[in-house]
Amino acid sequence: MKKLLLASAAAALIGVLAPHAAMAQATVKPGSAVDMVLLPKFLGIAVFDQAHNGAEEAAKELKNSKKLQYLGPTPENSVAGQIEIVTNAATQGVGAIMISNNSGDQIVPAAKAAHAKGIKVVTWDSPIPSAEGEDVFVAQVDFAETGKVMADMALSILGAEGGSFAVLSASPDAANQNAWIAAMQTALKDPKYAKLKLAGIVYGNDQSETSYNQALALVDKYKDLKLIMAPTTVGIVSAAKAMQDENLCGKIKVSGLGLPSEMVAYTKNGCAPQFALWSFVDLGYLSYYTAYGLATGAIKAEAGQSFKAGRMGTYTITKDPTRKEGLRILMGPFSKYDINNVEAAAK
């Protein structure tokens, strides 16, 4: 009788634990023909072109006979353009859409419509805030970490005396930018950042001229400004150029997220002493592997699912801790640049 009870208890325990057991690592097999769309926030941005190169590398590796469609809206029509591209892709019946979302939750109806047709929807760089209509988000780095890195760079540049700084962001609808800034504001509550004062936030819409003008407007508005923090590769270059053109690099520094190849001159002349970024080539590569694996059925969009993504190694899908809902694949890592390593990284 005791053995029977023990056996029953063991069976019940297995029944409880089974759904939470680790999933077997998925094998993403090459050779399937899958129509896929890579959708950046908009065209004409260097980091998105790098992501495209990474996706093409993965496509070649996976021997997908279907040509990758790299489609994007114009900067002036980014939100409506992204929605239109997703809607058209769904009508075409593609296998997977990879979106760097610049539309907030406005893209949800189009994403849900695509998802309802069996199309796999992977976001990269910037997720759908509510996660509705999305299978998984491929995150370049942890968003909370991004905020802390920004706060740390501000502290390092401004030193013990601290001072006033402002943020030059991309667009108000960019989920990634908003999350990074919110994380930075949370980090700034730590007493060690007590002497850093966030004066304000402006948006350059990832347009060079607009960002340049917004940087100068910050200088005019905040007379005690010591630093412009730009978590956008377009914004940081534009702000650095504006400070250089106005001979303000000795008074106002620039930092944020930038490409070494675009920032090397500004780091060497002292306008932008520190900045950070990750590999967009790797981000495009991993996003393609993820979307292809989902579309071919090799990968399940479930927490605990792991898979090998070619040269980048093994990744695991988890619940996204930065959103109330949604799944995430965390890529990483951050790279920080200064006068000691920027030239080598720029080559």
Question: What residue spans do the PLM features occupy?
Answer:
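Extracytoplasmic "Venus flytrap"
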Residues: V28-A58, L62, Q69-I83, S100-G104, ...
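Hydrophobic alpha-helical
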Residues: T87-A90, A96-A116, M184, G200, ...
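Short, low-complexity disordered leader/linker segments with a strong preference
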Residues: M1-D35, T91, K112-I119, E343-K347
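Flexible loop/hinge segments that line or gate small-molecule binding clefts
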Residues: P109-E145, S156, S164, P260-K268, ...
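Short, solvent-exposed amphipathic alpha-helices that sit
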Residues: V47-L62, T146-M150, A175-K195, T210, ...
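Hinge/cleft segment of the Venus flytrap/periplasmic-binding protein
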Residues: A26-A33, P172, N176, Y288-K347
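Hydrophobic alpha-helical segments within soluble ligand-binding/sensing domains
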Residues: K29-G31, Q82, V138-S164, T210-Y212, ...
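Short beta-strand elements in bilobed, periplasmic/extracellular small-molecule ligand-binding domains
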Residues: E61-P75, S164-V167, K189-D206
